[in-house]
Swiss-Prot record:
Signal sequence, renumbered to the chain: 1-22
SUPFAM superfamilies: Group V grass pollen allergen
Annotated family: Belongs to the Poa p IX/Phl p VI allergen family.
Pfam families: Pollen_allerg_2 (PF01620)
Superkingdom of the source species: Eukaryota
Key words of the record: Allergen, Signal
Lineage: Eukaryota, Viridiplantae, Streptophyta, Embryophyta, Tracheophyta
Protein name: Pollen allergen Phl p 6
C-alpha cells in the first residue's frame, strides 16, 4: 500500500519539496532546506538499480553522510532550523522503524518528503521578498 502511494506521489510530483526548483532561496533557512532536499534526492538516486530488499540500507548509507553535513551547516548558519530538521529526521526514521522490512524505504521517503515540504513552506511564507 505504501509503495503504491509513493509511486503515485512520485508521478504527481509530491515526493519532492517546493525547493526542488532551486535558485529561489532568499534566506539562510531556505538555502539550507534546498541543500537538504538536494541531498535527499541524491540519496534516493543511489537506489535506482538496487534490489528492493536493499533499497533502505543503500539509501540510509548515502543519506547519513549528507545529513550530518547538512545539520552541521544548519548549526552554524541557521540554528533556529535545527529543531525543525531534527523533527523531520526523527519522524522519517520512526516511520521506517515501524514499517515492514520491505516497506522501510518507501515509509522513510514518504514521511521525510512530506515533513520537509511543511518546514520548507514556513520560511518561504515568512521570508522578506524584495520589491519588484
Amino acid at each position: 500500500m505504501v509503495a503504491m502511494f509513493l509511486a503515485v506521489a512520485v508521478v504527481l510530483g509530491l515526493a519532492t519539496s517546493p525547493t526542488a526548483e532551486g535558485g529561489k532561496a532568499t534566506t539562510e533557512e531556505q538555502k539550507l532546506i534546498e541543500d537538504v532536499n538536494a541531498s535527499f534526492r541524491a540519496a534516493m538516486a543511489t537506489t535506482a538499480n538496487v534490489p528492493p530488499a536493499d533499497k533502505y540500507k543503500t539509501f540510509e548509507a548515502a543519506f547519513t553522510v549528507s545529513s550530518k553535513r547538512n545539520l552541521a551547516d544548519a548549526v552554524s548558519k541557521a540554528p533556529q532550523l535545527v529543531p525543525k530538521l531534527d523533527e523531520v529526521y526523527n519522524a522519517a526514521y520512526n516511520a521506517a522503524d515501524h514499517a515492514a522490512p520491505e516497506d522501510k524505504y518507501e515509509a522513510f521517503v514518504l514521511h521525510f518528503s512530506e515533513a520537509l515540504r511543511i518546514i520548507a513552506g514556513t520560511p518561504e511564507v515568512h521570508a522578506v521578498k524584495p520589491g519588484a
